Amino acid sequence: MILCLDAGNSRLKCGLFDGSGWRMQGAVNYQAFDDLIGELPEKPTSILACNVAGEAVRLRIEALANRLAISLDWFISSATSCGVTNSYDAPEQLGADRWAALIGARTLHSGPSVVVMAGTATTIDILDGNGVFRGGLILPGLALMRTALAHNTADLPNATGQFRSQPTNTDDAIISGAIHATLGAIERLLATLGDDRLCLLSGGAAAELAPHLGVPHRLIDNLVLEGLARYSRACSSIAPH
């Protein structure tokens, strides 16, 4: 029984994987870290963790493994894994969460795709039909766009409006602008590829984007966890780090 952990910038996502399916999945902010772990239906035999949240979170995960007296392996990017090839100039510099999401995407969809992870940052990654990662984009996430305007201007609020095609108030204009900007990046990248490949959407803000996206798409819960599960099942060696 493997406890898969996706330690993102804003939240910790976890899933208990038994080798064939999920026993549970959940997500919390880091203040409630111990509460989530306390809700596990049974003790895991090991932990596989993907961490992009920094050293403090890394230490908390290590402390958890020590408390449970189980092994801990860190998922890191590599040149190839689980049928996916990494074409980054320096493969090890690709974010581990992006790499896990690409593996998850390849597991769930065998054709070419664009993989969108909408979190604190939004990443838009190209995966071809042979499982080769061809590169991608990084832009501020929806919430980060909103707070950047609030923190760096004198008069704009930290908006709590709604998406509108033609906004007529400031809050709606900010919310709609952030969503339009992200949709535009996704749709423009797809247009440059010149085909009708599927867009796979995941992450905390994915549900805000999906209703307005004008290309074929599929909304997936916890794509990073899906990649970790695939890695744990299919790869015989996990490099400790």
What is each residue range found by the language model?
Residues M1-R23, A105, G111-F133, L149, ...:
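Gly/Thr-rich phosphate-binding beta-strand-loop-beta motif of the actin/hexokinase/Hsp70
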Residues M1-S81:
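N-terminal glycine/serine-rich phosphate-binding loop of ATP-dependent small-molecule kinases
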Residues R11, C50-V57, S176, D196-L213:
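Glycine-rich phosphate-binding loops at beta-strand->alpha-helix junctions
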Residues A69-G83, G214-A229:
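Conserved phosphate-binding/catalytic loops in two-lobed NTP-binding clefts
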Residues G83-S113, G227-I238:
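Conserved phosphate-binding catalytic cores of ATP/NTP-utilizing and phosphoryl-transfer enzymes
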Residues A100-V114, R134, L139-L156:
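Small-residue (GG/TT-enriched) beta-loop-alpha framework at ligand/catalytic clefts
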Residues L139-L193:
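Active-site rim beta-loop-alpha module in soluble metabolic enzymes
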Residues A154, I179, H217-H241:
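Glycine-rich phosphate-binding/hydrolytic loop that grips phosphoryl groups
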